[in-house]
A protein has these predicted regions:
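Short glycine-rich phosphate-binding loop at a beta-alpha junction
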Residues: 65-75
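Active-site catalytic pocket residues across diverse enzymes, especially alpha/beta-hydrolases
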Residues: 63, 89, 93, 148
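Active-site-facing substrate-recognition patch
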Residues: 1-65
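Gly/Ser/Thr-rich loops at beta-strand to alpha-helix junctions
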Residues: 75-81
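PRPP-dependent phosphoribosyltransferase catalytic core
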Residues: 2-10, 14, 143, 147-219
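A contiguous pocket-lining binding segment that forms or flanks enzyme active sites
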Residues: 114-158
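Short, glycine/charge-rich flexible loops or terminal/linker lids adjacent to PRPP-binding catalytic cores
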Residues: 83-124, 138, 203-206
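Structural detector of well-ordered beta-strand residues that form the stable sheet scaffold
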Residues: 71-72, 99, 152, 184
Length: 219
């Protein structure tokens, strides 16, 4: 793992954003997971700065190969992520535009459903916390298309590398195949397992590996 990924994991663990529990956490899918990541707890200036810095490093990581003009944050959770991350990118010497959508289309003033930079004719990367079913991302993809943007990638905080209820592939893999674009995450389940192997007890690692064996994507 790269230093920014290790820092991100440590901050998440230290602030109970990444949690582990022997009895597990019930997910929306109904599965009982030994870990839970709650990005909504990056809710202070310091923590949001650390989160956006991790996103920025992931964007600039050559291995992720992002090429874009505008960072798009889907309403509502993606809005602060887009704004904070372009600030972090600027601090690291890369100046990019940001944009986000309104849930309710404005019919006065400048009107429209987009706030921030125009998407027309520009390469766009979507930023979000996680991809569960992919529904919210698909809605964002349609907004970008209608606004004349060209979607080139998606970045999320965590890839659970977990099969959906409908298939043996993950939501991220499905989006990659469906949209034929670059989809990346700051960290993956594999990264979490490697991190816990060095920082937490053997029992936690065994629970994570058992969960991955049961629900993880193959290959």
């Amino acid at each position: 793992m790269r230093p920014y990924q290790l820092d991100f994991l440590q901050v998440s663990l230290d602030n109970d954003i990444l949690k582990f529990r022997n009895e597990g956490f019930v997910l929306k899918s109904g599965r009982l997971s030994p870990y839970f990541f709650n990005a909504g707890l990056f809710n202070t200036g310091r923590l949001l700065s650390q989160l956006s810095t991790a996103y920025a490093h992931a964007i600039l990581d050559p291995a992720n190969a992002f090429d874009f003009d505008v960072l798009f944050g889907p309403a509502y959770k993606g809005i602060p992520l887009a704004v904070a991350t372009v600030q972090a990118l600027a601090t690291l010497g890369t100046d990019k535009e940001y944009s986000f959508n309104r849930k309710e289309i404005k019919d006065h003033g400048e009107g429209g459903s987009i706030v921030g930079a125009s998407l027309k004719g520009k390469k766009v990367v979507i930023i979000d916390d996680v991809i569960t079913s992919g529904k919210a991302i698909r809605e964002a993809v349609e907004i970008i298309r209608l606004e004349g943007g060209v979607l080139t990638g998606i970045l999320v905080a965590v890839d659970r590398q977990e099969q959906t209820l409908e298939s043996t592939t993950s939501a991220i893999e499905s989006l990659k195949d469906e949209l034929n674009i670059n989809v990346q995450a700051i960290i993956t389940l594999q990264d979490i397992i490697e991190f816990t192997r060095k920082t937490l007890g053997k029992e936690t690692v065994q629970q994570l590996e058992a969960y991955r064996k049961q629900y993880g994507v193959k290959g």
